[in-house]
């Protein structure tokens, strides 16, 4: 009888212990939340280049500041954090780990629509300060009067977003930051009829010129469903009026070469055999963006003027220019 009583007592103790351990009324640990980020790779593509990924240079991945917006489930009432150093009001930023630790707890956060914006200037910050709803982000933009390199340059505006339940997991991992700009690279191999011995002034090829046509001025934090055009060209002159076009420079001939600019190759006889141009630009939803190049022909004396004068090469860019895409072209003229 004593044995049965002992077994019953032990069984009751085990049941009581199990019930107390699984009691839903027991408080769950409420910890501060964390958000980790990464810079997304470029999508590299073009007429002669297969689809691939490219992480870009250190300058193209640079982050100088962050702006966090944590909207509630309805896309309203955002908690906002501007981060310009390792410590800020509401948390700390660990750049080596690409992680933000906030003072906000899991219960305070709950489920959130999280947006991370990087490299904001004063105008963009002021606009973000006024954002009240998720949809407002599509109106926040940066305007560049001359929207090509070198005016569009590192550090680049980036953004990324995810929806996350912080009650289930206090860490929101790997929010991808996508550059809000695109990149165009044009490598031109010249045939013999364009291989002249150039006049070089301060490193630039006087006879070779180019212009950007119908580039968009606006860089949006979050792209509108249909982006409206605000276009400009780098020169007003339309072929064959090329007086105000840009002469071909040699910035890409330096070492180390910058990520964008112009460059060229000379052979042993001093003739131009190749041209290269790399520029950043804004996304576009409508076609019409073009790179135009004026190429001088070799004057062999067989044709009267102006037949042996410069010729026009026109590179139409894609009908839609997508952010964070690197369009690379290898052409022979």
From Swiss-Prot:
Residues 19-53 form a propeptide. It holds the Pfam family MfA4_C. It is found in: Fimbrium; Cell outer membrane. The record marks 53-54 as: Cleavage. Residues 1-18 form the signal peptide. InterPro entries: FimA_N (IPR029141), MfA4_C (IPR054771). Keywords: Cell outer membrane, Fimbrium, Lipoprotein, Membrane, Palmitate, Signal, Virulence. Its main location: other. A lipid is attached at residue 19 (S-diacylglycerol cysteine). Disruption phenotype: No effect on autoaggregation. A lipid is attached at residue 19 (N-palmitoyl cysteine). One of its GO terms (cellular component) is pilus. Gene3D superfamilies: 2.60.40.2580. Component of the fimbrium tip. Minor fimbriae are composed of a structural subunit, most often Mfa1, and the accessory subunits Mfa3, Mfa4 and Mfa5. Mfa4 is required for Mfa3 and Mfa5 insertion into the fimbrium. Fimbrium assembly occurs by linear, head-to-tail oligomerization of fimbrial subunits. This is mediated via insertion of a C-terminal beta-strand from one subunit into a groove in the N-terminal domain of the following subunit. Belongs to the bacteroidetes fimbrillin superfamily. FimA/Mfa1 family. This is Minor fimbrium tip subunit MfA4. It comes from Porphyromonas gingivalis (strain ATCC 33277 / DSM 20709 / CIP 103683 / JCM 12257 / NCTC 11834 / 2561).
